């Protein structure tokens, strides 16, 4: 992905104040934001042409909830399944984490959340362009890129992935 192209974060959150707060945090950190007030709209956006690099998802939504969103997302084509970070006020987050991981969530934060922890998670997981436009851009970048030896990443100690 072109390093000058901003990553697009889909924020699926029904509470307008929380959605605006997340938008402000993400935009000030240099991300593009696509808001969705419910799971149905979020799923429509994932099925559209605009690339989505990550989803921030509330669990308690009108109509289909966050769990249903994750299940529907899992049934989509692989290029329509961006990473998901759950951000929810549920008291049962510790109990739900295994189910959320099983459904594809990379991370789960409880509201109120630590802004730096959220941004660290977004930076870590928002790495993949999805959608028709993203797939086309990735394909053209691969064709245009000269062949090179694959680089090996060095990691420190244990994984920092939070679930």
Spans of features found by a protein language model:
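Acidic catalytic/metal-coordinating carboxylates
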Residues: 38, 65-68
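C-terminal output helix
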Residues: 113-122
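Alpha4 helix (beta4-alpha4-beta5 surface) of REC/receiver domains from two-component response regulators
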Residues: 68, 91-107, 120
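Short amphipathic alpha-helix used as the core "switch/output" element in two-component signaling
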Residues: 67-80
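Acidic, metal-coordinating helix/loop segments flanking the phosphotransfer/catalytic sites
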Residues: 35-54
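Active-site residues of response regulator receiver
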Residues: 58
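Hydrophobic/aromatic residues positioned on beta-strands within the core alpha/beta folds
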Residues: 87-88
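Charged docking surfaces used in two-component/phosphorelay signaling
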Residues: 20-28
């Amino acid at each position: 992905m072109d390093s000058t192209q901003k990553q697009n974060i889909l924020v699926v959150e029904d509470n307008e104040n929380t959605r605006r707060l997340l938008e402000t945090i993400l935009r000030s950190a240099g991300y593009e934001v696509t808001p969705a007030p419910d799971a149905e709209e979020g799923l429509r956006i994932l099925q559209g042409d605009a690339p989505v690099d990550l989803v921030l998802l509330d669990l308690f939504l009108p109509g289909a909830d966050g769990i249903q969103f994750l299940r529907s997302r899992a049934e989509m084509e692989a290029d329509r399944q961006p990473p998901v970070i759950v951000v929810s006020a549920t008291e049962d987050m510790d109990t739900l984490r295994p189910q959320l991981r099983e459904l594809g969530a990379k991370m789960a934060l409880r509201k109120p959340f630590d802004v730096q922890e959220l941004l660290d998670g977004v930076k870590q997981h928002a790495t993949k362009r999805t959608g028709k436009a993203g797939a086309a851009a990735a394909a053209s970048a691969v064709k245009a890129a000269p062949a090179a030896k694959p680089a090996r990443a060095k990691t420190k100690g244990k994984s920092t992935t939070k679930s």
